[in-house]
A protein has these predicted regions:
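Short beta-strand-to-loop element that shapes/binds the nucleotide-sugar donor at the catalytic cleft/hinge
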Residues: 2-29
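Short catalytic/ligand-binding loop motif for oxyanion handling, primarily in non-cytosolic enzymes
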Residues: 10-16, 55, 105-114
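A contiguous catalytic/ligand-binding core that recognizes phosphate-bearing ligands
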Residues: 20-45
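A recurrent flexible, glycine/aromatic-enriched loop bordering the glycosyltransferase active site
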Residues: 40-61
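Donor nucleotide-sugar recognition loop
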Residues: 53, 63, 67-89, 96-105
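Residue-level marker of regulatory loop/turn positions in helix-turn-helix DNA-binding domains and
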Residues: 58, 79, 147
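Active-site donor/metal-binding and catalytic loop motifs
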Residues: 97-142
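Non-catalytic, C-terminal membrane-associated alpha-helical segments of glycosyltransferases
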Residues: 142-205
Length: 205
C-alpha cells in the first residue's frame, strides 16, 4: 500500500495522531488554520519510505489486496480508525510505503469526537496482543520511549477534553509505561479534569 503521510511505528499504546516526530514519514501539503503547510520527512534519499501506518487521506492498494483485507465497516463505524486497522492488517502480511516523488494534499485537520475514542478502544481490543509493530530498528529503550509518549498524549487529551467515559481505559494504558516526569506533566490536566467534573455535578445538581 502507498500513501503520502504515515508512521514507521504503531505503538501498543493508543495513539490519536501517531507519535514521536522521528517516526513520521510524509510528503504532504496540509491545510491547517487557514494556511497550507508543507510536511516532508523521509528515511534516507529513497523515493519510498517503509511504514506501518498510512493516513487514510490517501490509500493506494492493489485490488487483490483490498479484496483480501477490506475495511471493517461493521466494527469501525463513523469513519475513525478504519484506516489504522486496515494498515495493520496489510503490514502483517505485505508492506506499506510513503511516496516521496509526489506530494499529496490534505484539506482536513481531522476531528476528535466521541466516535473516535470509541473506535480507539475497539482497535486496542483487536490488536493489543500484536503491537507494537515497527519497520525501523529500535532498542528496548526506544520502544519504551515511544510507548510512554503515545500513552501520555492519549491520556492527556482524554483528561483535558473531559472524556470521562474513556478515562479508566486511558489510565490503564498509561500505567503500563508511566514515568515520574510524565506524571508531573499530567498533573495540570488531571486538575483540569477534576474541575470539569465539579462543574458537571454543579450543573446537574
Amino acid at each position: 500500500m502507498i500513501g503520502f503521510f504515515g508512521y514507521a511505528l504503531k505503538t501498543r499504546s493508543p495513539s490519536l495522531s501517531g507519535g514521536l516526530k522521528r517516526y513520521v514519514r510524509a510528503s504532504l501539503y496540509r491545510h491547517a488554520g487557514g494556511r497550507v503547510v508543507r510536511t516532508e520527512n523521509r528515511a534516507g534519499e529513497a523515493d519510498f519510505s517503509p511504514v506501518v501506518q498510512v493516513d487514510g487521506q490517501c490509500l493506494i492498494v492493489p485490488k487483490s489486496v483490498w479484496r483480501e483485507h477490506p475495511f471493517d465497516e461493521e466494527l469501525f463505524r463513523d469513519f475513525h480508525l478504519y484506516d489504522v486497522d486496515f494498515c495493520v492488517c496489510i503490514a502483517c502480511r505485505y508492506a506499506n510505503y510513503i511516496c516521496h516523488s509526489v506530494f499529496g494534499e490534505h484539506g482536513s485537520v481531522g476531528s476528535y469526537d466521541d466516535d473516535r475514542y470509541r473506535n480507539v478502544l475497539l482497535f486496542q481490543r483487536r490488536w493489543d496482543g500484536c503491537l507494537p509493530l515497527t519497520v525501523v530498528p529500535m532498542s528496548p529503550r526506544e520502544v519504551r520511549e515511544a510507548e510512554t509518549f503515545a500513552a501520555y498524549k492519549f491520556y492527556k487529551r482524554v483528561l483535558s477534553e473531559g472524556r470521562s467515559a474513556y478515562v479508566p481505559f486511558a489510565r490503564s494504558m498509561y500505567r503500563r509505561y508511566r514515568t515520574g516526569r510524565a506524571d508531573l506533566r499530567l498533573l495540570r490536566h488531571a486538575l483540569h479534569y477534576a474541575l470539569i467534573l465539579c462543574r458537571r455535578r454543579l450543573r446537574h445538581g
